[in-house]
Amino acid sequence: MSRIENESGFLSSDAASVGSEDDKVEMKKRNGTIPKEDHLKSMCNAYQSIIQHVGEDINRQGLLKTPERAAKAMMAFTKGYDDQLDELLNEAVFDEDHDEMVIVKDIEMFSLCEHHLVPFMGKVHIGYIPNKKVLGLSKLARIVEMFSRRLQVQERLTKQIATAMVQAVQPSGVAVVIEASHMCMVMRGVQKINASTTTSCMLGVFRDDPKTREEFLNLINKR
């Protein structure tokens, strides 16, 4: 029998940080010797330049504090670069003799497209089959947050979440599906308001066993 949760509770902890080499370089920049205040100041100057180059008056009342606000917002949008997986899990990995599917679905996700720096948002569904260890359920949502709060593409985000789950609890299998709407397709370019993108990453038994994969997909689509 499968277990379905909608973002609550607890699971497991065994990991190091994951991601591409580019991710690690960016994390080093944010966690390194450059003070946060210096990052913020440089970003404020950059936003001031952008506002001026679109033809606006930087001294107009409504724009006086916009560079600072925008810089602080961007720092928040990309705070995932400051996170490390082992710290995020915080020992929430538990020994448990459970070998049936665990699913946390409809995890809300917001990220920034690395190509245009505009948002994409949607829902993440994660399933895994434990191998003697389970992870605190809320940690699945935190893993999503860690990787979505970076400059991303949906395909890589999907894989990073799945890989983090493998590092966290070494399960028999992991499945991740993301359904998202991209503002780069809505606000510019083809301007298709109702278009959505679905990506998946299936590892272990979810990749090897069609019946297990089908069970997961049926359960996340059940309302």
Curated annotation (Swiss-Prot):
The keyword tRNA processing does not apply. Zn(2+) binds at C113, H116, C184. One of its GO terms (cellular component) is cytoplasm. Signal peptide: none annotated. GO terms for molecular function: GTP binding; GTP cyclohydrolase I activity; zinc ion binding. It is an enzyme of class 3 (hydrolase). Disulfide bonds: none annotated. It catalyses: GTP + H2O = 7,8-dihydroneopterin 3'-triphosphate + formate + H(+). Keywords: Allosteric enzyme, GTP-binding, Hydrolase, Metal-binding, Nucleotide-binding, Tetrahydrobiopterin biosynthesis, Zinc. InterPro entries: GTP-CH-I_C/QueF, GTP-CH-I_N, GTP_CycHdrlase_I, GTP_CycHdrlase_I_CS, GTP_CycHdrlase_I_dom. It comes from the Eukaryota. The keyword Acetylation does not apply. Toroid-shaped homodecamer, composed of two pentamers of five dimers. PANTHER family: GTP CYCLOHYDROLASE 1, GTP CYCLOHYDROLASE I. This is GTP cyclohydrolase 1. It comes from Caenorhabditis elegans. The lineage of its organism: Eukaryota, Metazoa, Ecdysozoa, Nematoda, Chromadorea.
